[in-house]
């Protein structure tokens, strides 16, 4: 229980220098299902920090299940394109990571395990698409609807601060049968497409009587 309390960020840590949300984790030395069960019994979820430069080692960690569960519920689909400042107890400095392979218990949605991929400019992030300006499109206003082909798009970001929460696609133009492509996405500075620019995102469909 003492270790569990220590993994919960203090008020000072929440006000830390970074603008990124912060996660506290503890190093762990033992892997395997028996060790994972012991961690879960203590309110912790096992995880791995990996990726980044080739020379950087894979790290075994444990994270407070309740703290990570709150993040998952608050951010939902956007959690895997949210950059976190990860503090490993007993080590100087922090790492910028994104959650990956989050496994939930089916009955309760408790976090069974979660891995953390180190951020790099080469990392492909799947960012949710947000279709806007439908009210300015005459075809859509007259009863047509958008048939979405993709709900997210792969992008690379120059730095962690430029990772967007969502990508906007304007639907102001386009009539019946119009296809919106990756080229219609408004990319923020420092963000470039990893998905082909010609990839179809949505289709304007007129309802049949």
Residue spans for each PLM region:
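Extended basic (Lys/Arg/His-rich) segments that typically form rRNA-contacting surfaces
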Residues: 2-209
């Amino acid at each position: 229980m003492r270790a569990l309390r220590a993994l919960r960020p203090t008020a000072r840590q929440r006000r830390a220098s970074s603008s990124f949300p912060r996660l506290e984790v503890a190093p762990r030395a033992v892997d395997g299902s028996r060790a994972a069960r012991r961690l879960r019994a203590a309110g912790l979820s096992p995880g791995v920090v990996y990726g980044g430069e080739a020379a950087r080692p894979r790290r075994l960690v444990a994270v407070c299940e309740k703290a990570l569960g709150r993040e998952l519920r608050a951010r939902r689909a956007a959690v895997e394109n949210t950059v976190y400042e990860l503090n490993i107890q007993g080590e100087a400095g922090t790492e910028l990571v994104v959650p990956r392979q989050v496994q939930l218990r089916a009955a309760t949605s408790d976090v069974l395990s979660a891995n953390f991929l180190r951020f790099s400019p080469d990392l492909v992030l799947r960012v949710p698409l947000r279709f806007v300006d439908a009210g300015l499109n005459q075809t859509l206003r007259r009863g047509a609807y958008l048939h979405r082909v993709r709900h997210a798009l792969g992008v690379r970001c120059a730095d962690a601060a430029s990772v967007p929460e969502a990508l906007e696609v304007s639907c102001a133009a386009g009539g019946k049968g119009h296809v919106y492509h990756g080229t219609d996405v408004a990319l923020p500075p420092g963000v470039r497409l990893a998905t082909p620019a010609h990839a179809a995102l949505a289709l304007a469909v007129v309802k049949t009587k």
